[in-house]
């Protein structure tokens, strides 16, 4: 995660969406769609055929019109796939041609309401507030699109650097009280009578897709046995 003035910025993606106007949650207008609702036999698990449409803002969302190279060797796009009603997975694009792409199959695949978007390639970096990390050539290079007229050297950048501020194993009667956790959280394992009380957790967990880690559950707040 990347933050400016404590606000989360958007990982470079297609179709574009933002946090500050709520469009990032609007899958009917700011995600791409598969044709499965028109024909449940149009394709099978592991394939999506894009269904072009014009969203509520008047923007055409059409994969074939973008000219992307989604399956470039070692630089494949990451597809975020909502293919199981309330379940979403991330997968590398394994093959792409025109309006069709392939990915490693997912569990609980359903023949209705397929939504998706892409991350993981620099060509998606085209909107103010988006960012991308170059994991191909120089892992120290971070790209950010600042607002028009804004000098990025004067912005207050902060980045998530760890999953857990406290990772506690086999402990008893340990208490964490009245702390604020920003872009980090806590993990307890095999403990007894441990307590987290009066704490604020702001952006505690996130995927590691920017580091090209896919098909992995985010490291979340946990009390594990």
Label the model's feature ranges.
Residues 1-224:
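Extracellular polysaccharide-degrading/modifying enzymes targeting complex plant/algal/animal polysaccharides
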